[in-house]
Amino acid sequence: MSRRNAAVKRPVLPDPQFNSRLASMMISRLMKHGKKSTAQKILSDAFSLISERTGGNAVELFETAVKNATPLVEVRARRVGGATYQVPMEVRQERGTAMALRWLVTFSRGRNGKSMSQKLAGELMDAANETGSAVKKREDTHKMAEANKAFAHYRY
């Protein structure tokens, strides 16, 4: 293991357009090949589609969607005496948010639709209504943790 100091965690600055740290994190997750302006346009278009369809504030709906997709527990593999157990562990808030954003982007890309902004808008609206693939993934993660509760004492 490295003896050097741990890297300092840089603070995430809020996105200038939406004044939201979550939006800034989402842009980073959407970005491919360093094309940040394209990712910003995708998020901006998705937010305008959401506002158009719901008539509400898109940023608030986005924050609700992320909250609904954020897992509270996860299972991690732990090897004990030749056997590998799925050990349920609590998820730190930062990691939970990162997982939710990653799932939202992944399942948006897998959706049927014309443009990425339309697919992202659809996934965000579904997640805000507690439906959609990202929320299903969270529920599956929670079910796995519940099923493996017996191995919780192997926590590290």
UniProtKB/Swiss-Prot annotation:
InterPro entries: Ribosomal_uS7 (IPR000235), Ribosomal_uS7_bac/org-type (IPR005717), Ribosomal_uS7_CS (IPR020606), Ribosomal_uS7_dom (IPR023798), Ribosomal_uS7_dom_sf (IPR036823). The keyword Cell wall biogenesis/degradation does not apply. GO terms for cellular component: small ribosomal subunit. Keywords: Ribonucleoprotein, Ribosomal protein, RNA-binding, rRNA-binding, tRNA-binding. GO terms for molecular function: rRNA binding; structural constituent of ribosome; tRNA binding. One of its GO terms (biological process) is translation. PANTHER family: RIBOSOMAL PROTEIN S7. Part of the 30S ribosomal subunit. Contacts proteins S9 and S11. Belongs to the universal ribosomal protein uS7 family. One of the primary rRNA binding proteins, it binds directly to 16S rRNA where it nucleates assembly of the head domain of the 30S subunit. Is located at the subunit interface close to the decoding center, probably blocks exit of the E-site tRNA. NCBIfam families: rpsG_bact (TIGR01029). This is Small ribosomal subunit protein uS7.
